[in-house]
Amino acid sequence: MQNVLKSFLTPKNIQVQTISPCHFRILLEPLERGFGHTLGNALRRILLSSMPGAAIVQAEIDGVLHEYSSIEGVREDVVDVLLNLKGVAIKLEGREDAKLTLHKKGAGTVTAGDIQTESGVKIVNPDHVIAHITKDGEINMTLKAAMGRGYEPSSARSTGDQSRSVGLLLLDASYSPIRRVTYSVENARVEKRTDLDKLIIDLETDGTLDPEEAIRFAAAVLQHQLAAFVDLKQESDRDGGGKEGKVNPLLLRPVEDLELTVRAANCLKAESINYIGDLVQCTENDLLKTPNLGKKSLLEIKSVLAQKGLSLGMDLKGWPPADLTDQ
């Protein structure tokens, strides 16, 4: 069986073309015939549905009790303002949520750049229009941004009208930083073979996530999901233990073997996370609480672990082993 696996071609020519800062085109070749559509469709679906990101999830506007009303001195009604808030591209680093404020008075255009942010929060599209104020108008609002994945309707976060404060407006949240993904397959040639595939992925983001990083993360997610099928291990094995309680040797290796960036490695070392087994037991929230470890470093760690068939939040029974000593 191993000889058959080795006979499959793997992509050796990978090109990344930058169309714009938020638009990349990735070309992979050669692939066995049919694999272009197999991989292209899987990666596209993961990119569109499963990428983590941030979005504004709720708003409180002075003088507004519900979304079906208007704001004095503002051209748009509340529904339009909320729709425009959904278009704000926001990036949270090292935190799960953030409180934002917006205060503006006098005639003019209200843009995303008028939002006052906390540390670790960045507005990527400051020119995005939120509302227009007339001569004597004024707008004051308090916003909440949060991390998430995919799409979440406001009803999923509603705790009931009785416990919800008056004037708190919930927004449907589209957390995904991916704006558009398409793929196509063309013919590729290797020596005399002309029946091979070339996969072309066209990817656009909202600017909060680098397209190249996005495709790497999607590939890592796919690899991690398929890892269970490789050996068809029992659940206890996938949790880190073997059939006789043996520990996966990979978990005993130092974190340095993951070859993380200096920033990520130093953050883990400062928290006394010395072994890969220590790391995989941490959750995303645990790592985001680590000083100086941001979302980009978290994505890097998850991607590297996924490449090795591991993930964060694993339950390792009997960890650390009795014979494990600090190096």
Swiss-Prot record:
Residues 247-327 are annotated as: Alpha C-terminal domain (alpha-CTD). It is an enzyme of class 2 (transferase). GO terms for cellular component: cytoplasm; DNA-directed RNA polymerase complex. InterPro entries: DNA-dir_RNA_pol_insert, DNA-dir_RNA_pol_RpoA/D/Rpb3, DNA-dir_RpoA, RBP11-like, RNAP_asu_C, RNApol_insert_sf. The N-terminal domain is essential for RNAP assembly and basal transcription, whereas the C-terminal domain is involved in interaction with transcriptional regulators and with upstream promoter elements. Homodimer. The RNAP catalytic core consists of 2 alpha, 1 beta, 1 beta' and 1 omega subunit. When a sigma factor is associated with the core the holoenzyme is formed, which can initiate transcription. This is DNA-directed RNA polymerase subunit alpha. It comes from Coxiella burnetii (strain RSA 493 / Nine Mile phase I).
